[in-house]
């Protein structure tokens, strides 16, 4: 059993805020398993590495002997979290939410211990509130308090509409903590308002308020925005090992340390040694390979990580093409920009032309020079960037 000092050090590793720390210490001194909650609305079918930053911390609480619940917001998912949005999020159907929830359950157990994880659905208690319960819940807060939220404030000041149900979202999430009598709730920094709402509602219901622990948001592959599907800068935990490896190797050397801090389980002393080694001339690529292999081994296997490393070396350091790639057929006479888009190698024809101008598109290893090229009939390997290949036959 870890001492309180050791447990606190593990809990605080890589966090953004602990609100308030002294209350967590007091709860730890009670020498009982604490009730730890992480909630997630299943608004998309897949989990990416950005989500795993908080899941890793949840795993830490499991290893320290606490009771962990992964709460699936099947009810709140149909309301739609307005956090960070400048327009109203379209609500999902119950069918969408439940389908996504099944995928979530499969993916979270790549990190959490299934034997030590309780899965709950917040429709269990929120569906029972009814109209009277909803009105009573809404009476706990004022419109002025809700407008303290940065995203609501910006929309209000900008004359953009805010739907009434969006004001309810923080209250519903906060009520989850009341229903579960949560001791500690985890979330990203963008969830701070909602998490603190849980503290307020617990106090008003005569409960001890939960401690709020926020984790930093993982920066996406572009090095600018937070990792998200909408920004197309994410790495999915279910992606094939070679794709994951290539994406991790593509991040900047500076961003690599953010990934080590948020995603790695290595001792902090070892990560500091990596920094010192690089300062003394070690190639950043070699350190990045260690990061990529650690992450891939976690979500796939060590054998997959080794194979992905070898594939990367063959493809990018030796100039070899991958052994496997999509094989497609199209009618001859198609313009190169349309062909690359239809083959899934780029998102749009404008992306295709941009890649051609930058020298990032090739046919059988030869750079495409003409943005208006009509490729000749026959079979060839088309490449865009370093990772996207397709063997295409034009008939």
Curated annotation (Swiss-Prot):
Localization (cell): Cytoplasm
EC number(s) from the headed UniProt entry: 6.1.1.1
Keyword Cytoplasm tagged: yes
Catalytic activity from the UniProt record: tRNA(Tyr) + L-tyrosine + ATP = L-tyrosyl-tRNA(Tyr) + AMP + diphosphate + H(+)
GO molecular function ontology, one term from the record: ATP binding
Residue interval(s) of motif 'HIGH' region: 42-51
Record-level GO cellular component terms: cytosol
Name of one Pfam family that matches: tRNA-synt_1b
InterPro entries xref list: aa-tRNA-synth_I_CS, aa-tRNA-synth_Ic, Rossmann-like_a/b/a_fold, S4_RNA-bd_sf, Tyr-tRNA-ligase, Tyr-tRNA-ligase_bac-type, Tyr-tRNA-ligase_bac_2
Chain location of the short sequence motif 'KMSKS' region per the record: 226-230
GO biological process assignments: tyrosyl-tRNA aminoacylation
Binding positions for ATP per the UniProt entry: 229
Domain S4 RNA-binding residue range list: 334-394
Keyword Coiled coil belongs to the record: no
Gene3D superfamilies hit by this protein: HUPs, RNA-binding S4 domain, Tyrosyl-Transfer RNA Synthetase
UniProt entry keywords in alphabetical sequence: Aminoacyl-tRNA synthetase, ATP-binding, Cytoplasm, Ligase, Nucleotide-binding, Protein biosynthesis, RNA-binding
Subunit structure: Homodimer.
Task of the protein: Catalyzes the attachment of tyrosine to tRNA(Tyr) in a two-step reaction: tyrosine is first activated by ATP to form Tyr-AMP and then transferred to the acceptor end of tRNA(Tyr).
Family, per entry: Belongs to the class-I aminoacyl-tRNA synthetase family. TyrS type 2 subfamily.
NCBIfam families, A to Z: tyrS
Name of the protein this chain belongs to: Tyrosine--tRNA ligase
